[in-house]
């Protein structure tokens, strides 16, 4: 059986991205591998072994084109309202809180936030199918 271990995003500014993921999700640098032309930085927290891999290509000087195929990464939290307020307090500009409904039933409460390079992250209230 396959096990998801990380999701990689290409970033322009190492420090700006590390700061965002630490403030937003409590992710810390677990490993940093410098290959000369590029750098891999693995971020994680105590909640899960799943990591966000930041790739810094040193020759890249302009923002990446994100395209229209990629959607988002999703994380769950215990209290989505409190997390939304905390992120606002950190100056991270989370999007509006929304309810995800199907057949008149609320399946989840969530919001989106974008990292410094524009990658969207969905923050979902933990519960139901989103544990």
Protein language model features and the residues they cover:
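Exposed loop/turn and edge beta-strand positions of beta-sandwich/beta-sheet ligand-binding modules
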Residues: 37, 69, 107
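Short amphipathic alpha-helices within nucleic acid-binding modules
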Residues: 20, 80-86
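Vicinal oxygen chelate
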Residues: 75, 84-131
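Short, charged/polar surface micro-motifs in flexible loops or helix N-caps
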Residues: 46-50, 59-61, 78-82
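N-terminal beta-strand motif that seeds the catalytic metal site of vicinal oxygen chelate
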Residues: 1-18, 70-75, 124-131
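Core segments of cupin and vicinal oxygen chelate
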Residues: 2, 8-51
């Amino acid at each position: 059986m396959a096990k998801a271990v990380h999701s990689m995003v290409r970033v322009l500014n190492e420090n700006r991205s590390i700061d965002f993921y630490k403030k937003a999700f409590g992710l810390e640098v677990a490993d940093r591998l410098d290959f000369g032309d590029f750098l891999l930085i693995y971020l994680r927290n105590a909640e899960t072994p799943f990591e966000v891999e930041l790739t810094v290509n040193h020759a890249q000087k302009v923002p990446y084109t994100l395209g229209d195929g990629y959607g988002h990464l999703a994380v769950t939290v215990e209290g989505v309202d409190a997390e939304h307020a905390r992120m606002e307090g950190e100056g991270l500009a989370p999007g509006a809180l929304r309810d995800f409904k199907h057949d008149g039933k609320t399946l989840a409460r969530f919001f989106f936030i974008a990292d410094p390079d524009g990658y969207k992250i969905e923050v979902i209230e933990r519960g139901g199918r989103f544990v």
